[in-house]
């Protein structure tokens, strides 16, 4: 019996198996497929596009005669996968990401400002009213410029005005500059007023760390200066007295580093 590979012959084969006793129980789908048999064979078959026909194995075309010689093995170029971008998953590209990249390349110091690392739902910007850049529940940053630019573009389409992406970005950027200057000016004025009324501002953690480090740097600078003087004096004594003058040079039993700290502890 010829083996049937087509999916349309499954009903016929199953009926033969039932009559021959190979299958004892009827499958659950037997009656359904018998009432509604498949009408289309979905098996893919090779198509002959040329009159001369198509070779069964496409790799045979590699070893054709080229310049009077036969190729005995495939080269790297033959084995290279061509059109590999067809099966590659395309990258998601958004206009917002391009605007963020442009803004933070033009304003790298915006990265130094503190950020609130709180997990959100991801659509908090859609809940804000971007008809104005300054928001109540969101600090002023580069994301404000991005969302304000998108709002200006969408608004221009609704009003029927022709505004380019660069014009919308520049308008949002200059508005950001104005609000940032107002924010810094307000902060400076409030600090001066607080100082005038007797407020004392503690040094920040960074400045405190620098001051602590500077104290040790000053100590080691003085110790290094004394050690340099001792080393220079010993060299001058050896050069003036010659080899015989080495006996007159008194060696120090303690280093200059230890002496400095001992003097500080005693004082």
Curated annotation (Swiss-Prot):
Q: Which InterPro entries match?
A: Ribosomal_mS23_fun
Region (Disordered): which ranges? 230-267
Q: Which UniProt keywords apply?
A: Mitochondrion, Ribonucleoprotein, Ribosomal protein
Offer a single GO CC term for the protein: mitochondrial small ribosomal subunit
Q: Which GO terms describe its molecular function?
A: structural constituent of ribosome
Cell compartments where the protein resides: Mitochondrion
Superkingdom field: Eukaryota
UniProt keyword annotation of Chloroplast present:
no
Report the family membership: Belongs to the mitochondrion-specific ribosomal protein mS23 family.
Q: Which PANTHER family match?
A: 37S RIBOSOMAL PROTEIN S25, MITOCHONDRIAL, SMALL RIBOSOMAL SUBUNIT PROTEIN MS23
What is annotated about its quaternary structure and interactions? Component of the mitochondrial small ribosomal subunit.
Stated name of the protein = Small ribosomal subunit protein mS23
This protein's encoding gene: RSM25
């Amino acid at each position: 019996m010829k083996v049937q590979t087509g999916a349309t012959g499954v009903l016929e084969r199953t009926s033969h198996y039932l009559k021959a006793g190979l299958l004892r129980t009827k499958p659950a789908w037997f009656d359904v497929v018998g009432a509604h048999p498949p009408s289309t064979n979905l098996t893919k078959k090779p198509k002959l596009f040329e009159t001369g026909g198509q070779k069964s194995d496409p790799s045979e075309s590699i070893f054709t005669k080229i310049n009077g010689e036969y190729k005995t093995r495939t080269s790297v170029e033959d084995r290279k996968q061509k059109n590999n971008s067809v099966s590659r998953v395309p990258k998601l590209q958004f206009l917002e990401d391009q605007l963020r990249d442009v803004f933070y390349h033009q304003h790298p110091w915006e990265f130094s400002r503190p950020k609130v690392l709180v997990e959100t739902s991801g659509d908090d910007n859609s809940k804000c009213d971007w008809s104005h850049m300054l928001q109540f529940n969101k600090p002023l940053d580069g994301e404000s410029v991005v969302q304000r630019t998108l709002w200006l573009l969408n608004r221009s389409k609704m009003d029927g005005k022709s505004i380019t992406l660069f014009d919308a970005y520049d308008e949002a950027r200059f508005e950001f500059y104005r609000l940032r200057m107002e924010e810094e000016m307000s902060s400076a004025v409030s600090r001066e007023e607080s100082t005038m009324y007797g407020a004392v501002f503690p040094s920040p953690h960074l400045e405190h760390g620098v001051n602590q480090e500077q104290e040790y740097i000053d100590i080691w600078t003085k110790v290094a200066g004394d050690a340099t003087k001792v080393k220079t004096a010993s060299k001058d004594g050896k050069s003036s007295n010659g080899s015989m003058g080495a006996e007159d040079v008194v060696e120090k039993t303690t280093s200059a580093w230890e002496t400095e700290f001992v003097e500080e502890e005693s004082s």
